[in-house]
Amino acid sequence: MIVIFIFILIAVGLLSTKILHRYISIKKIPWYVYISVWIGWFMCFSIVILVPIDILCTDYRQCKHISDSQSEKLNEIITNISNGTNSGSNNNNNNNNEIINKYDSCEEPWAYISNDKLEYIYQTFYFGTLLLTWLVYPLMGSFVLAGDFHLSGRITRSIKENAYLYLIFGVIGLVVMIWLLAVKQLDWNSMVGFAMAAANTWGLCLVIILMGYGLVETPRSIWVSSQRSLVLKHLQFKAVELLNSKKKANEELIATMKVIRRIQEKTKKYDPYEKYIKIIVDQCPPEQYALVQRGEGDGEATYSVLVALNSRLKNAITNSQRAEFLYDQCLVEAFELQDIQNSAISLDKNVNWSFREQRQGRFAKKLDIMEWIWYNYLEISVFRVAAIVFAVLSLLIIWSEFALAFTSFDISVLSNIVKHSNVSNIFVQFILFFPLGYEALTCYSTLFKIRIFNYYRLIPHQHSDSNSIIFSAAYLCRLGAPLCYNFIQFINMNSGIEDNRTSFSVVMGTMNVAPFLGTYFYIYFPLLIVIVCLSTLFNVYSRIMNCLNISKFRFDVDFSHEQIDEGKFLIDSERRKWTQNNIKPLSSKSPPPSLDSTSNNPKQIFKSGSTTISKQSPPNLNVSGGNINNNNTNNGNTSSARSFIDSFLKKSSNNNNNNNNNNNPYEQTLLFDESNDFDDDDDIESGGAGRPTYNAHLSSSFNGGANSTSISGYPQINKMFGGANRYSQLPKK
């Protein structure tokens, strides 16, 4: 059995590595961040995997205990049966058979682990996650963000930044400890239990909120994914926002490099800060920094100024890289979705991908046909069936949470399955794995989509920064134990009977040591998940935002908006330029190296397929009928259309601001929802009558003028069409 247990841990380690590899690369972030995050993820996932095994082992030990306690009675019954004394009683025979069957059913589970070993493993993983969450990850996050040029300086700064927080916690902990010793007269073990109860209470609050959102959003997002026209419309709307975000990030990077240029110009040779300035300059993207001819600022260089500037540059490069990838990924998703829609009328039964390599080999044709069948006949049905299955699982979990309040009788479906089924049945073992696995999926997937002021955000294809992955690991560790404790609660495996308590419950201890929390808190607080689910189902968050004049558009198949038309034009234009210039998406390239403040190697973050625009001979553009055509594609000085459009838009925007003298009666600003939004993209709403919808966020003020109709991403482009403008002014909110 120990071999199976080791195999399970190896599988958990591989799973942790696979998921972690989706978001970060060892080449991109410091090695110590990668290892510490991997350890935290591994211990958290291991706790989730071990709990179902723990439940099976506990049920097996309980069965053996009952069988052993009745062994004498069983022997007497067997003797009576052999002598024929009870042959006339059918009821007694039925009872005898039931007892014998119960005895025979106590078979050892396929992954049985002794109670002592499980408790030791739980203690190691649980207290390891506590250490990482409350000590290692906060210090490491501050260390990674520090702009100091020496190791000692970065360590000192990270300790100082966290010292205030630890001081507050220390004072509160000291007061509580004195109160527990003086008033409650608790011993050391009880105080440790109190600390665990406080930590688990905070974790349980997070679990209820995140899981409540995920239980509704997971099946709904899968159902919405089957409506391709709606998804494409949302991508068109989102492309404009991402283009604006990309421009802002690039402008911040250029502004930072201008400050660096000014300091470099004023720094003389053999200056004591020259080596630090060289480190900062070497981190700037070479091609972009070469275009910065004149600096800005006072140019005064002190150590504190250079430290702050180094940190600012690292953040600017990270944000620019992130914005570039998100915009690129949005375009790729739109291109692929258009290719799938066009393949429906394909006579050769093949999906003609615009930006994918064609398959090669003897089975290439068959694989292409199978792929075409999947996208045109199977995918939509599979998505809808999966959405229905997940919706049923969500209802099962919500009912189990609701059943916790009924302590006098057991109405939990999962609890009754565990109690009245044979533990050796492999089907029952999988029944235990699936609900907890689905809980972890809904909770963790919501955590991975969280973005706090666009600062902590996990980006797939290894484009996440170190601080975001540390933040996710810290909260992942906080959620593991409370999630499992809640699962054990609603299957009634946490009673006070020693033989009926799981090893996990023994390690976690009782929660009665916290008087203002107590057992009732863990029974009735999960009922709030019903409120969270209903709020998510009926889009209460969106309605609150609308009341605050932060418009959230409800996307359905009939929804139309000027920004969707603009995004459609943008995506079509980018498709032509990608095709002409043979541009490949960022997701197909390896991520850039890490931004280490102590390194002197230049860092390049932009696509290798892009080249710079020649100022002497920029590409010629013909604008007619809403199309932009590049007539200089064969010129050696021609760059990618994306780089030219960005520079063209920036120049046009500056001209527009100068011509209007900043007297425009409106102000246009397209924003991301930078609140604690759960979704990596935009929230999904329900449009009523069974029609799912998307949310998109648009600020309430818009910019326009008498001589120009400005649209986000293309401030002056409508002036070139002559005649009536294609896009009308958006109404002021």
UniProtKB/Swiss-Prot annotation:
Keyword Transmembrane among UniProt keywords: yes
Coiled-coil annotated residue ranges, if any: 232-266
Family listed: Belongs to the LIMR family.
Membrane-spanning intervals of the chain: 1-21, 33-53, 125-145, 163-183, 191-211, 386-406, 423-443, 468-488, 513-533
Polar residues biased stretches: 596-619
UniProt protein name: LMBR1 domain-containing protein 2 homolog A
Domain of life of the organism encoding this protein: Eukaryota
Keywords on record: Coiled coil, Membrane, Transmembrane, Transmembrane helix
Pfam family, one: LMBR1
Feature: compositional bias, Low complexity: 620-640, 654-664
Annotated stretches, region: Disordered: 581-641, 649-668, 674-696
Gene Ontology CC entries for this record: membrane
PANTHER family: G-PROTEIN COUPLED RECEPTOR-ASSOCIATED PROTEIN LMBRD2
Cellular localization per UniProt: Membrane
Topology of this chain in the membrane: Multi-pass membrane protein
